[in-house]
Amino acid sequence: QFPTDYDEGEDDRPKSGLGAR
């Protein structure tokens, strides 16, 4: 999927600029 820069438990929303639409 996307880089491991996501907040697990936040609807798979990127907290960084890695994979952010």
UniProtKB/Swiss-Prot annotation:
Q: What is known of its domains?
A: A long coiled coil structure formed by 3 polypeptide chains connects the central nodule to the C-terminal domains (distal nodules). The long C-terminal ends of the alpha chains fold back, contributing a fourth strand to the coiled coil structure.
Subcellular location, record wording: Secreted
Modified positions (Sulfotyrosine) in chain numbering: 6
What post-translational changes are documented for it?
A: Conversion of fibrinogen to fibrin is triggered by thrombin, which cleaves fibrinopeptides A and B from alpha and beta chains, and thus exposes the N-terminal polymerization sites responsible for the formation of the soft clot.
Q: Give the glycosylated residues.
A: 4
UniProt subunit comment: Heterohexamer; disulfide linked. Contains 2 sets of 3 non-identical chains (alpha, beta and gamma). The 2 heterotrimers are in head to head conformation with the N-termini in a small central domain.
Ranges annotated as biased composition (Acidic residues) = 1-11
The GO annotation for biological process reads: adaptive immune response; blood coagulation; innate immune response
Q: Enumerate the residue ranges of region (Disordered).
A: 1-21
Give the main location: secreted
Instruction: Relate the protein's function as given in its record.
Output: Cleaved by the protease thrombin to yield monomers which, together with fibrinogen alpha (FGA) and fibrinogen gamma (FGG), polymerize to form an insoluble fibrin matrix. Fibrin has a major function in hemostasis as one of the primary components of blood clots. In addition, functions during the early stages of wound repair to stabilize the lesion and guide cell migration during re-epithelialization. Was originally thought to be essential for platelet aggregation, based on in vitro studies using anticoagulated blood.
Q: At what positions is Pyrrolidone carboxylic acid found?
A: 1
What is the protein's name according to its record?
Answer: Fibrinogen beta chain
Q: How is this protein annotated for GO cellular component? A: extracellular region
Which keywords does the record carry? Adaptive immunity, Blood coagulation, Coiled coil, Disulfide bond, Glycoprotein, Hemostasis, Immunity, Innate immunity, Pyrrolidone carboxylic acid, Secreted, Sulfation
